[in-house]
Structure formats: C-alpha cells, structure tokens
Amino acid sequence: MAREGLTLRCTDCKMENYITKKNKKTKPEKIEVKKHCHKCNKHTLHREKK
C-alpha cells in the first residue's frame, strides 16, 4: 500500500511524540508540523523521522 505509518520527532529535544500516516505517492516530501511537545512543554516544530 502507498499509505505508511511514520513517527514525528521534536526538533528541540529529539523526542518521538506522535505517530501518524501519510500517502507516500501523493506526498513524497517529509512532513513538518508545529505540535505540542510534552517534554519541552511548548509548541515546537515536529519533523518526520528518517
């Protein structure tokens, strides 16, 4: 299937906080979203883990 699971990692503390899915055929680029990090206790940029 084209839709695969992935992990979002905080760019500040490198903690893996969120698990999501994306369609790799329609969105081949890496995901970047601002989400709340529980360790940093603030909104930070989360990127797709390699």
UniProtKB/Swiss-Prot annotation:
It comes from the Bacteria. GO terms for biological process: translation. GO terms for cellular component: cytoplasm; ribonucleoprotein complex; ribosome. Keywords: Ribonucleoprotein, Ribosomal protein. InterPro entries: Ribosomal_bL33 (IPR001705), Ribosomal_bL33_CS (IPR018264), Ribosomal_bL33_sf (IPR038584), Ribosomal_zn-bd (IPR011332). One of its GO terms (molecular function) is structural constituent of ribosome. SUPFAM superfamilies: Zn-binding ribosomal proteins. It holds the Pfam family Ribosomal_L33. The keyword Ribosomal protein applies. Belongs to the bacterial ribosomal protein bL33 family. NCBIfam families: PRK00504.1, PRK00595.1, rpmG_bact. This is Large ribosomal subunit protein bL33B. The lineage of its organism: Bacteria, Bacillati, Mycoplasmatota, Mycoplasmoidales, Metamycoplasmataceae.
